[in-house]
């Protein structure tokens, strides 16, 4: 059970409902529990939503790359919520199920090419702490400066999301089904 109330739009004062409306418009699904928990601080929800939307829609890195990175963050950090939600996003982005099922073995699985391995290795190391120089050099072989910056911020953001999900004990929504 979540450690904070999971708020709906009508639970907020009228002055704060606009951010909830923006949230619902940008997500296109029923409102996720992480967002409902963050609605306890609507001012922060507003800023967090802006960053999250920019990372989803305003970057050069493709959706497949982003979702591989986010799945690795969720896997390494032990966040079932993040992993499950981004599993679905990865499938919708076009990543094959077989590849997702082999994620833990990305270093040796023939389903992953050198570019995939570079992003997954970076996401794993960055989530755990220090990124090796060799890992960074390999990442940079595949991504230019802008894309590398977007990857750094994306991985950092989703590691931050885990640091919200885990202590607040956010669980998957009753309506959520992993594909």
Residue ranges and their predicted role:
Residues 1-179:
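Hydrophobic alpha-helical segments
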